[in-house]
Design a protein with these regions (language model features):
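Short glycine-centered segments of the SAM/dcSAM-binding site in methyltransferase folds
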Residues: 81, 137, 161, 226-227, ...
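Glycine-rich phosphate-binding loop and adjacent beta-alpha segment
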Residues: 213-283, 318
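Short, glycine/polar-rich helix-capping loops at beta-to-alpha or helix-loop-helix junctions
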Residues: 89-92, 167-174, 238-243
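NAD(P)H dinucleotide-binding glycine-rich loop of Rossmann-like/cofactor-binding domains
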Residues: 81-143
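Glycine-rich beta-strand-centered segment in the early N-terminal region that forms part
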Residues: 22-39, 49-88, 95
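C-terminal hydrophobic helical "lid"/dimerization subdomain
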Residues: 34, 266-318
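Short amphipathic alpha-helix with an adjacent loop that forms part of the alpha/beta core around
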Residues: 190-200
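Mid-domain Rossmann-like dinucleotide-binding core that forms the NAD(H)/NADP(H) cofactor-binding site
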Residues: 120-188
Length: 318
């Protein structure tokens, strides 16, 4: 089989290699999956760069999220379509613990299935963690990202008002159409001024995917006693925290990682999360964008396309 690996951490376009390997044999608790589609997430790039919360054991395969079909399993018939996460999905076959497989809902395409877990469950989980209620205000950074679009749509269904930031004013109308209340171009508009005009006391919560100065400006938009969940670092810069702001406004800043949150859930909560998120994704009201697809052998083109500014949809490796 073909697989994409890296023997050292660094820029994906520089360190990734395509090699031939034997198809693995599943152990008793595992299933062999033929992968049919993968999407590229920020965590994939950070993992290759050695910047993620999981340290790669070199040489390592890349990719965390995929959709595929069961090839061998003691529990599922051959050909059963499944969704899963694993370390190293940029390959043709992978062995996955059978208990971690999620059957793909009937009618869900591979284009959606291969991105049905990481971003949608993150959006859902952060909304659950925040405790936001109908009528409250949420500010998110990276509003035009796949995660941002899902937060906007899920929040709208809950009656939560969303303000989001973008780096390109051309993206504003599309996000308004999805349900954002206000969209702010951080390159040309004053975020704090716009937020204060809409919500004089400040927003109830902030979800930050960017970090750096943009994260600091978002933090300053919180109301007294507000809460900020930090889950991304797209800027690769730390947030410069204003201690006085934290103290006198009694603000709470927390890290949020999907892996830790998911592991904290009981089985019933996991079932409910999957059911609710997949219901969202299967409704015609929810938009899941794909910009471009590449073959596994075109992985370098895929990572270059992923890193282009102004992208409006996911990059898939099929």
């Amino acid at each position: 089989m073909k697989q994409v690996i890296f023997k050292e951490t660094g820029l994906p376009e520089s360190v990734l290699l395509l090699e031939e390997a034997a198809i693995p044999e599943p152990r008793a608790h595992e299933s062999l999956i033929r992968i049919t589609a993968r999407n590229i997430n920020p965590s994939d790039i950070m993992f290759i760069q050695g910047r993620y919360g999981i340290t790669p054991k070199l040489p390592s395969s890349a990719g965390f999220e995929a959709a595929g079909e069961v090839e061998k399993s003691e529990q599922y018939p051959k050909g059963t379509r499944v969704i899963f996460t694993a370390i190293g999905t940029w390959k043709e076959y992978v062995c996955v613990p059978t208990a971690q497989l999620i059957p793909t809902p009937e009618g869900m395409s591979d284009d959606v299935a291969c991105q049905a877990f990481v971003n949608p469950i993150t959006a859902y989980g952060m909304l659950e963690t925040s405790g936001l209620q109908k009528g409250q205000w949420l500010l998110i950074t990276a509003g035009a990202s796949a995660w941002g679009k899902l937060v906007i749509q899920m929040a709208k269904m809950r009656g939560i008002q969303v303000i989001c930031t973008v780096r390109n004013g051309a993206q504003k109308q599309a996000l308004m159409d999805l349900g954002a209340t206000i969209v702010v171009d951080v390159h040309t508009e004053n975020l704090g001024k716009i937020v204060r005009a809409a919500v004089e006391t400040g927003v109830d919560a902030v979800f930050d995917a960017v970090g750096g100065e943009q994260g600091a400006k978002a933090l300053a938009c919180l109301k007294i006693g507000g809460r900020m969940l930090v889950f991304g670092l797209l800027s690769l810069e730390p947030i410069p925290l204003n201690s006085g702001l934290l103290i006198f406004k009694n603000l709470k800043v927390e890290g949020w990682w999907l892996t830790s949150w998911w592991e904290s859930l009981g089985q019933e909560s996991i079932k409910n999360a999957i059911k609710e998120v997949f219901t969202y994704l299967m409704t015609q009201e929810v938009q899941v964008d794909v910009q471009e697809k590449f073959a596994l052998s075109e992985f370098k083109k895929a990572v270059i396309a992923y890193q282009k500014e102004g992208r409006t949809g996911k990059i898939l490796i099929c």
